[in-house]
């Protein structure tokens, strides 16, 4: 385990480094259609989102980690007094191939779908007062009849202002906030326990290998992080070093790792998830259908999925990553700043280092 002093040093370095990386203002490719998201208040902290295809192409949009996902995922960012309210829901890693048809929504040009959700469920709004809600990011897409992610589309919403009743919001937040601290590795018995333990332990040397590759920079680093700048290389390496330290022990550390799904979040298309506010990681049944380490560039496996989830948890390295883009095509379309905050950029880079992609 790291000392408090070393943790504070890493946090200070991360905050300074991320602040020093200017988000790219380069325009996205013209052939990527844009989704418009219209946010309106229904009642209290209940919000409706209307997602519209503003492009001239048909879209088959993945709903996992996006609007229409029934899990407590991050659909919007919430701001109070100019600062973002920390997200307290889950971050999912889902399959990038073999996805079920029901997790996609087809939208022709000009067509829309709706979703309603309570922003107080995944953000502590008990202080009440005025908040601002908005959404911007990338949604994954596939061909109309496909089950493999093949593209990405940018989405952006209006800014919605809501006056929050703190007491009512606190009740909604409490319904998600029912987690307790447990031992480092939990519910891990039998073949699944063996598979998870092996994957966690092998995450340590792979993360260390990725840290070394990040410090050296090169083609793969530039592909995923869009720069060969030394400051960015050091920041990426520091996160991988932290993952390697955390994964080196299954009996101590800053995360609680479940081999099963104690909170009922999993679905057939979800591999694992993290609850960053509690530094909790849980594997889903689909995790165990993956190979231990894939021999396919840009592929998914148990080891890099565990690395993906470790990067989400701020107890390992703060701030934890977000889920901005999934898969090679989407991840390599991100700017440097976005890639530094994207879990799949780290897991895909580790895969590239391991296989020499």
Curated annotation (Swiss-Prot):
Region forming the signal peptide: 1-19
InterPro entries: Fungal_M35_metalloproteases, MetalloPept_cat_dom_sf, Peptidase_M35
Localization (cell): Secreted
Entry's Gene Ontology BP terms: proteolysis
Superkingdom: Eukaryota
Protein EC: 3.4.24.39
Record text on cofactor binding: Binds 1 zinc ion per subunit.
Pfam families: Peptidase_M35 (PF02102)
Chain positions listed as propeptide in the UniProt record: 20-182
Recorded catalytic activity of this chain's protein: Preferential cleavage of bonds with hydrophobic residues in P1'. Also 3-Asn-|-Gln-4 and 8-Gly-|-Ser-9 bonds in insulin B chain
UniProt xrefs under SUPFAM superfamilies: Metalloproteases ('zincins'), catalytic domain
Function statement: Secreted metalloproteinase that allows assimilation of proteinaceous substrates. Shows high activities on basic nuclear substrates such as histone and protamine.
Protein name per UniProt: Neutral protease 2 homolog BDCG_00922
Source species of the chain: Ajellomyces dermatitidis (strain ER-3 / ATCC MYA-2586) (Blastomyces dermatitidis)
């Amino acid at each position: 385990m790291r000392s408090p002093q070393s943790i504070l040093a890493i946090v200070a370095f991360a905050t300074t480094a991320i602040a020093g990386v200017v988000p790219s203002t380069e325009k996205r490719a013209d052939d990527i259609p844009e989704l418009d998201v219209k946010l309106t208040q229904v009642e209290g902290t209940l919000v409706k989102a209307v997602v519209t295809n503003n492009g001239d192409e048909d879209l088959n949009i993945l709903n996992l980690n996006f609007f229409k996902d029934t899990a407590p995922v991050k659909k919007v960012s919430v701001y109070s007094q100019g600062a973002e309210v920390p997200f307290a829901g889950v971050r999912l890693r889902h399959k990038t191939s073999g996805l079920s048809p029901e997790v996609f929504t087809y939208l022709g040009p000009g067509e829309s779908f709706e979703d309603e959700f309570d922003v107080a469920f995944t953000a502590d709004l008990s202080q009440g007062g005025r908040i601002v809600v908005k959404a911007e990011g990338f949604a994954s897409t596939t061909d109309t009849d496909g089950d493999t992610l093949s593209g990405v589309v940018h989405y952006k919403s209006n800014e919605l202002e809501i006056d929050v009743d703190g007491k009512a919001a606190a009740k909604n937040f409490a319904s998600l906030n029912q987690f307790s601290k447990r031992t480092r590795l939990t519910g891990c018995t039998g073949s699944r326990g063996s598979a998870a333990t092996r994957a966690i332990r092998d995450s340590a040397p792979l993360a260390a290998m990725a840290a070394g590759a990040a410090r050296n920079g090169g083609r793969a680093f530039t592909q995923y992080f869009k720069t060969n700048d030394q400051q960015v290389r050091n920041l990426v390496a520091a996160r991988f070093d932290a993952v390697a330290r955390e994964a080196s022990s299954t009996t101590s550390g800053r995360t609680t790792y479940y081999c099963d799904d104690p909170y009922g979040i999993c679905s057939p298309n979800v591999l694992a998830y993290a609850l960053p506010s509690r530094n909790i990681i849980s594997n889903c049944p689909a995790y165990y259908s993956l190979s231990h380490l894939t021999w396919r560039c840009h592929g998914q496996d148990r080891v890099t999925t565990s690395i993906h989830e470790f990067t989400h948890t701020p107890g390992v390295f703060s701030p934890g990553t977000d889920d901005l883009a999934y898969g090679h095509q989407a991840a390599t379309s991100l700017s440097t700043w976005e890639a530094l905050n994207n879990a799949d950029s780290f897991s895909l880079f580790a895969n590239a280092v391991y296989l020499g992609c």
